[in-house]
Regions:
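Helix-turn-helix
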Residues: 21, 25-55, 59
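Amphipathic alpha-helical packing segments from all-alpha helical-bundle domains
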Residues: 72, 96, 116-168, 179-186
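An amphipathic alpha-helix adjacent to DNA-recognition modules
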Residues: 11-16, 28-29, 49-73, 77
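Short, hydrophobic secondary-structure boundary micro-motifs
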Residues: 112-117, 198-201
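C-terminal peripheral helix-coil segments that are non-catalytic and often amphipathic
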Residues: 138, 142, 168, 172-236
Length: 236
């Protein structure tokens, strides 16, 4: 019993230390020596549980993606100016959620690293594809009625690649955030055959919304949720 307890406690301390360090120092900036010191475990203990820090990243990404659509829904505000039912429109929900992801990457370089690494690593990317495919099927099947959830999995590989590409390229004066969001949504919504009139309504809403303020609120809530889930306190 003691060995099982120690193993569970070591895993808890490792995940807590890793997630905190990923947020504070970035995924690539977090060295194995940092993790071992913060978690107070040996390299052998770490390797027995996770092998590499990629294993902890997978747990972190799973948690982050699990609540992303709920977070986006909470950020949608009612407006009569764009001509769509903002509270009950799944396409808008998708647009807000993906726009929040892209904006988070601009607000915090360490989150950018986490997202880009997640879309880059084959095992973690596969998890994202499979989790997202079901949501995409629910959202976009009215526009692509002949497709199965498996078909949406294949489309998600492409749109996730677009997401990764835009995330990895920081905004600047020549490619500001609003333009990045507009480009991504145009490509993604076209891939899912959303009618042009509907796309224009969605684009108008996103362009008029303060996505930086919305994403900043989501980021603070995310950090609080991560601190609670993985039992750590962020440095000031």
């Amino acid at each position: 019993m003691a060995r099982r307890y120690d193993s569970a406690d070591s895993k808890r301390r490792i995940t807590s230390a890793c997630v905190r360090l990923f947020i504070e120092k970035g995924y690539h900036g977090t060295k194995m020596t940092d993790i071992l010191s913060a978690a107070d475990v040996s390299s052998g203990t770490f390797q027995n549980i996770f092998h590499t820090k990629d294993g902890v990243l997978e747990e972190l990404v799973h948690f982050m993606f699990a609540g992303q659509f709920g977070a986006a829904k909470n950020m949608i505000h009612i407006s009569n100016e764009v001509g769509i039912d903002l509270q009950n429109d799944p396409v808008l929900l998708y647009a807000v959620e993906t726009s929040i992801q892209l904006t988070l990457a601009e607000l915090n370089e360490n989150l950018r690293e986490v997202y880009v690494e997640a879309y880059t690593q084959a095992k973690i990317a596969e998890m994202i594809y499979r989790k997202t495919a079901g949501e995409l099927y629910k959202i976009f099947s009215p526009y692509l009625p002949g497709l199965t959830e498996s078909d949406f999995y294949e489309l998600e590989i492409g749109t996730a690649g677009i997401m990764r590409g835009y995330m990895s390229r920081p905004c600047d004066m020549y490619f500001p955030l609003k333009k990045k969001l507009g480009c991504f949504l145009s490509l993604a919504l076209s891939a899912y055959k959303v009618p042009e009139e509907k796309q224009a309504q969605i684009q108008k809403y996103i362009a008029s919304a303060d996505m930086t303020a919305i994403a900043n609120t989501v980021m603070q809530e995310l950090f609080r949720a991560l601190a609670m889930r993985f039992e750590f306190t962020l440095s000031n």
